[in-house]
């Protein structure tokens, strides 16, 4: 692993956000940072939750996994001072229910749906939206469109392009907070028929 030795060189811990770890497309595998090697396990704080996968964010059910006892004790102490993000009875039972066998089966089916959605959107964008750059992801339910070339060619700003989408009912997200100066982020966690409809609307009314 190329990044091994980071803990020794920089004397730092790594806080690894793994909340999207369940969303892995067909044919791919996600490696949690702490599972890569023993060194990474000892310097990492793994943050995760069933909230994204099972839509449980309203119940407050995030948690962390810390193998290093020194780091774990420090985090536990700080957490106890604020009582921030403490679980409640509903969130505890929701978490337990989500991690039963039925939850695993449901997640497997969900990943198949997301894979189909992403593959369709990726192929459609590459075929119909000339000048829009997009990469096929290996997981999550987000797709990032780089519209730099398209906006330059058509003489409009990314803000104007975003408004075009919203005006025809395709609600997408500004990509600038995600280090994409002329980007748009699309959420593909929806029925396949709506992905088809969104792509068709964009072709007819936005990327023209």
Q: What feature does the model see in each segment?
A:
Residues 11-13, 41-42:
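A short helix->loop->beta-strand "cap" motif at the edges of active sites that frequently abuts
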Residues 43-127, 133-139:
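PLP-dependent aminotransferase class I/II
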Residues 67-68, 100, 146-148, 189-191:
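Residue-level recognition of strand-loop junctions within catalytic nucleotide-signaling folds
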Residues 114-115, 119, 128-167, 184, ...:
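Conserved PLP-binding catalytic core of the aspartate aminotransferase-like
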Residues 12-35:
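Conserved PLP phosphate-binding loop immediately N-terminal to the Schiff-base lysine helix
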Residues 35-39, 125-126:
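Short, conserved catalytic or adaptor-binding loops enriched in Gly and charged residues
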Residues 1-10:
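Single conserved hydrophobic/aromatic residue that forms the stacking wall/gate
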Residues 40, 153-156, 160-172, 177-208:
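PLP-dependent enzyme catalytic core of the Aspartate aminotransferase-like
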């Amino acid at each position: 692993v190329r990044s091994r030795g980071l803990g020794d060189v920089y004397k730092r811990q790594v806080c690894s956000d793994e909340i999207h770890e369940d969303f892995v497309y067909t044919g791919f595998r996600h490696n949690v940072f702490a599972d890569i090697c023993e060194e990474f396990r000892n310097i990492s704080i793994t943050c995760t939750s069933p909230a994204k996968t099972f839509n449980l964010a309203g119940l407050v059910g995030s948690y962390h996994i810390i193998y290093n006892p020194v780091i774990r004790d420090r985090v536990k102490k700080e957490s106890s001072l604020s009582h921030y993000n403490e679980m409640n009875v509903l969130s505890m039972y929701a978490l337990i229910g989500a991690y039963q066998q039925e939850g695993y089966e449901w997640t497997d089916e969900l990943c198949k749906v997301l894979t189909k959605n992403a593959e369709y959107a990726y192929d459609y964008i590459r075929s119909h939206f000339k000048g829009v750059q997009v990469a096929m992801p290996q997981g999550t339910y987000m797709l990032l469109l780089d519209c730099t070339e398209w906006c330059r060619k058509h003489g409009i700003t990314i803000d104007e392009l975003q408004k075009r989408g919203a005006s025809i009912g395709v609600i997408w997200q500004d990509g600038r907070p995600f280090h994409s100066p002329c980007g748009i982020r699309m959420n593909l966690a929806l029925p396949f028929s709506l992905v088809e409809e969104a792509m068709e609307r964009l072709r007819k009314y936005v990327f023209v």
